[in-house]
């Protein structure tokens, strides 16, 4: 299994082959990486230009956006993952990316920026365009979440602090991406009703994910106040469901593999929890008010937590590999890989740096040759023989 982990402290990343629990020889007691090397190096890289997000481009390149809104491209087929292209855009100075989305079929990538803008960059013949196109998002407020619709290229959703959910269309797609003269607003959400004290409920969206839907846009948002909200544009402008799943800020939101009926969330402490979106506990959240007494709210059923290995800090990087594994990393500098279904930890490695993002490299697993398989079987048979020949302990005579 091959992973690349972006590091906050160095501005680069670390990549390696990792051993899973079921692959550990019998004479060893804990999993460890086969090898770890520094990759995604950029000569000027520093904590001030650290990698925030990384994604694959046509399985050949890794595209990374950095804290200073610069973009780096690396060749994954090169043993050292060499730098192919790096661009710094004057137009984006002072902006921080909140997400990165690659459209490989149209040779383009889009970054959402915290300033309430989006940047479109072309990528042709292994080279990033020298200039990017800036799009001002409706609302004119800062954003913290910016998500692309997987089924409709050019459609995005965004939101932030006191900036409620909007779905917009930014560009048309043909052979190339063509920006619209003005951004078209497809949906603008309304806030939930006032709380039990008749006070306005604050808005602070941290993450957004599109849910597969045929006749409408369906989304789920996470908030700084520990809420999960589900929107259906056919249902109306207010959330179809509003759930209080925790009391801490939710900082990551991911589907559990290909299953969009379950999500994995992390907060700013050490929680990594898996919730169902279809099975609801009607009385799971309970609080008390001096004016109205007990307040009971429904919550998506908690299916379990990924806590083996002792998380001791906020988790910023979460990545699922197909329907098999989920990897996590954050402030405590440990990379942990879990079995997605059983939640058992299969690998834990100290990376020596705070982790921002995790990238699984698909298609890079080398198949074992017949000789390697035969050698492994011989080794296992040898260990079995040694175990069987070990003399039994004599019982003490009384």
Swiss-Prot record:
It is found in: Nucleus, Nucleolus. One of its GO terms (biological process) is rRNA processing. Residues 364-379 have a biased composition (Acidic residues). Residues 364-398 are annotated as: Disordered. Its main location: nucleus. Keywords: Nucleus, Ribosome biogenesis, rRNA processing. GO terms for cellular component: nucleolus; preribosome, large subunit precursor. Component of the pre-66S ribosomal particle. Involved in the biogenesis of the 60S ribosomal subunit. Belongs to the NSA1 family. This is Ribosome biogenesis protein NSA1. It comes from Meyerozyma guilliermondii (strain ATCC 6260 / CBS 566 / DSM 6381 / JCM 1539 / NBRC 10279 / NRRL Y-324) (Yeast). The gene is NSA1.
């Amino acid at each position: 299994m091959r992973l690349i982990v972006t590091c906050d402290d160095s501005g680069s990343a670390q990549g390696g082959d990792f051993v899973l629990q079921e692959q550990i020889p019998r004479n060893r007691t804990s999993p460890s990486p086969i090898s770890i090397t520094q990759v995604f190096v950029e000569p000027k890289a520093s904590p001030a230009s650290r990698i925030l997000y990384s994604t694959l481009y046509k399985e050949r390149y890794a595209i990374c956006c950095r804290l200073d809104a610069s973009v780096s491209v690396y060749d994954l087929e090169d043993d050292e993952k060499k730098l192919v292209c790096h661009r710094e855009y004057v137009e984006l100075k002072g902006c921080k990316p909140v997400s990165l989305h690659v459209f490989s079929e149209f040779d383009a990538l889009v970054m959402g920026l915290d300033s309430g803008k989006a940047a479109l960059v072309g990528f042709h013949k292994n080279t990033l365009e020298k200039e990017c196109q800036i799009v001002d998002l409706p609302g004119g407020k800062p954003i913290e979440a910016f998500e692309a619709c997987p089924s409709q290229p050019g459609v995005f959703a965004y939101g932030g602090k006191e900036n409620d959910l909007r779905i917009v269309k930014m560009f048309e797609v043909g052979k190339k991406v063509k920006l619209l003269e003005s951004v078209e607003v497809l949906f603008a959400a309304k806030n939930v009703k006032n709380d039990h004290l008749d006070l306005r409920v604050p808005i602070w969206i941290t993450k957004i994910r599109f849910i597969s839907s045929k006749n409408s846009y369906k989304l789920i948002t996470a908030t700084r106040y520990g809420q999960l909200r589900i929107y259906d544009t056919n249902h109306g402008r207010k959330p179809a469901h509003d759930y209080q799943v925790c009391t801490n800020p939710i900082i990551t939101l991911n589907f559990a593999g290909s299953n969009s009926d379950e999500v994995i969330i992390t907060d700013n402490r050490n929680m990594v929890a898996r919730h169902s979106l279809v099975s609801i506990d009607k009385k799971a959240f309970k609080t008390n008010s001096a004016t109205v007494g007990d307040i009971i709210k429904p919550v998506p059923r908690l299916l379990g937590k990924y806590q083996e290995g002792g998380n001791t800090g906020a988790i910023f990087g979460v990545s699922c590999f197909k329907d098999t594994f989920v990897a996590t990393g954050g402030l405590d500098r440990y990379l942990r890989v879990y079995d997605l279904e059983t939640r058992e930890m299969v690998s834990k490695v100290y990376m020596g740096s705070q982790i921002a993002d995790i990238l699984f490299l698909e298609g890079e697993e080398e198949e074992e040759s017949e000789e390697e398989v035969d050698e492994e079987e011989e080794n296992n048979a040898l260990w079995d023989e040694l175990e069987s020949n070990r003399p039994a302990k004599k019982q003490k005579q009384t």
